[in-house]
C-alpha cells in the first residue's frame, strides 16, 4: 500500500491544485466490460421491491437501505452476544493505482454486490465469494472539477439496469448482467464544475404511476447553480429539472416550466449594473442537491438537502452596506420537499439563512415517526446539519418541530428559535470584509468549521432504541474573508480557513441521541475525524468505520465497543447488511480519502499516516459455528 503524503494545505490554493491533479490522473480510464462470465440473470427489480427495501433482508436496493434512509436492518443473526465471532468472509481489491476516496455504499440484489469506486467505476461481485463478475471503468476527461476528491457514493438498481453518476457530469445506466452501457446522459458542463458524486435513487410518483430516477448535481464550490433531475429510468430522458436558486427557471418535459420561488428572487440582492439585474452571485448561487434524496410515498414527496450558496462569502450575497439577515439566499442550505410529478417545490425549510460558513444542507434526511414531549406523533424528517444542530421537521409541510446541538461548543449561533425556525446568531461570527487596501479580513474562530459537525457520512436510526447514531466531529477553524469574483472552472469561495483541533485526545465522536429530548445517551471518541456512515441492526448493534482503518461494532443501548477489525485503510463509507442462504453478511467499502485530507488543514496533517486503499470487505459468523449463530 502507498502511504498518503499530501502536505498540510494552505487555505484554498493547494486544495484546488490537488483537485485538478485528481482530474488529470483519471485520464487513462477506459470504459470496459469484464471478460469474466456475466452476472446471473436473476429477476428484474420492481418498484415494490424498492418500496419494501427497509423491511426485507435478502437485498439492499436503495441508498440509505430504504426510501426512508434509516439505515436500520431487522436482521439479528449477528447480535451483541455473538458479534465477537464475526470474521472476514471475503474481500475484493478494486486494483490499479486508484487507491483513494472510497465513499460508496454498496447495493445487493439476487446474490450480486454492486459497488462503485472512486474515479467513476462500478464493480459487480458475487455476494458469497467476492468473485468479480464485471467491471465498468468510465473514461474521464482531464478537466473535471471535483471539489472534495474523486469520490462516488453509490449506485441504484431498477429493472435490469444499474445507475450511477460520474465526475464529468453524466448519469449512466448499465446492463446489470454485463456492465455494458445502456444509456449515457450528460447533464452539465464539467469544466465549469458540474459533477455527480451522490447515488441516484428510484421513486414512484403516486399521481402518474411512473417510476422515476432521481439525481442531483454537485459543484457549489465552483459557482454552479444546483439542479435536481427526474429521468425515465428506461431511456434516461429528462422528465423535469428543478434549480435550487430562487428565481431560476425549471424545466418540465423539455420546456421551461416555472421559476423556483419568486421570479424576482428578493432573497438575493439586486444590481442594476448587471445583465440579470441581480448580483453576480445569483447567477452562480449553488444550492446543489449532491446527496441522495429520500422519498415519502404517503405524501408523494421527494425530500432532499440543498447545498451551500455560492460564493461562501456572505457579503457577495448581501446588498452594499446591507444586512445579511435581509437576504436569505433561498433555496440553499436547507431541506426541500419536491413534487415528483412536476418538480415543483412543495415546501422548504432553511437551516442556515444566508449561509456564511459553508454549512451545506445536503446531509441525509431520515424519515421517521417523531414523538414529541406530549406524546404526539409527527411524520418527520431528521437531519444532523453541518452547522452543528439536529433538526426535526414535519415532512408534510416543512415546519420545524425540534432542534438541538449534537456537537460541542457551537459558536456561530446560540440556539434555534423553535417559534420562528431561525437560528439566533452570535455577534461577530460572520467574518468582516477586508479593510481598504487589505486582501483578507480579520480571522474569526468558528465552530463547527466548514467541514461540519457532521458531513455527508450518514447517521442511522434504530427502530428498537428510538435513538439516532450520529458520526460527528469536534473541531474548529480560523475563518476569514477574501476578495471573490467568478471565473469559470475556478473555486468560487471568497473565504480562507484553517481547521484545528478542539480537544487534544479526539476529533471524531459517535453519539447516540434522543430526538425528543436532545439528550446524549452515549458517546464513543476517535482520535481521527469520523467520515464513515453508520448501520444499526435489530441485533442491538451499531456499526461504523474509523479513519485509521478499524471496522467496529457497538452495543446500541450502552455504546460499549464489542468488536473491531483492521481493514488496512481508512474507512469513509456507510456499511450495509443482508441475508443470503440463511446467513447474515455485513459489508463495507474501504479506502481513505475524501475532503479531510484535501481541505482539512491541521486535520490533513493528522491523517497523513493513513494508508490509501480500495477494497470491499464482507464479514459473517463462521458457517460452522451453529451454537451462537442464531438463525
Curated annotation (Swiss-Prot):
Transmembrane segments: none annotated. Disulfide bonds join 147-148. SUPFAM superfamilies: Quinoprotein alcohol dehydrogenase-like (SSF50998). Pfam families: PQQ. The active site is at 358 (proton acceptor). Residues 250-286, 421-443 are annotated as: Disordered. Induction: Repressed in the presence of lanthanides. Keywords: Calcium, Disulfide bond, Metal-binding, Oxidoreductase, Periplasm, PQQ, Signal. It catalyses: a primary alcohol + 2 Fe(III)-[cytochrome c] = an aldehyde + 2 Fe(II)-[cytochrome c] + 2 H(+); ethanol + 2 Fe(III)-[cytochrome c] = acetaldehyde + 2 Fe(II)-[cytochrome c] + 2 H(+); butan-1-ol + 2 Fe(III)-[cytochrome c] = butanal + 2 Fe(II)-[cytochrome c] + 2 H(+); butan-2-ol + 2 Fe(III)-[cytochrome c] = butan-2-one + 2 Fe(II)-[cytochrome c] + 2 H(+). It comes from the Bacteria. Ca(2+) 1 binds at residues 53, 56, 59. It is found in: Periplasm. Residues 1-33 form the signal peptide. It is an enzyme of class 1 (oxidoreductase). CDD domains: PQQ_ADH_I. GO terms for cellular component: membrane; outer membrane-bounded periplasmic space. InterPro entries: ADHI (IPR034119), PQQ_b-propeller_rpt (IPR018391), PQQ_MeOH/EtOH_DH (IPR017512), PQQ_rpt_dom (IPR002372), Quinoprotein_ADH-like_sf (IPR011047), Quinoprotein_DH_CS (IPR001479). Pyrroloquinoline quinone binds at residues 103, 153, 197, 215-217, 386, 531, 595. Belongs to the bacterial PQQ dehydrogenase family. Alcohol dehydrogenase that catalyzes the oxidation of a range of substrates, including linear and aromatic primary and secondary alcohols, as well as aldehydes, allowing bacterial growth with a variety of volatile organic compounds (VOCs) as carbon and energy sources. Uses a specific inducible cytochrome c550, encoded by the adjacent gene in the locus, as electron acceptor. Homodimer. Interacts with cytochrome c550. This is Quinoprotein alcohol dehydrogenase PedE. It comes from Pseudomonas putida (strain ATCC 47054 / DSM 6125 / CFBP 8728 / NCIMB 11950 / KT2440). The lineage of its organism: Bacteria, Pseudomonadati, Pseudomonadota, Gammaproteobacteria, Pseudomonadales. The gene is pedE.
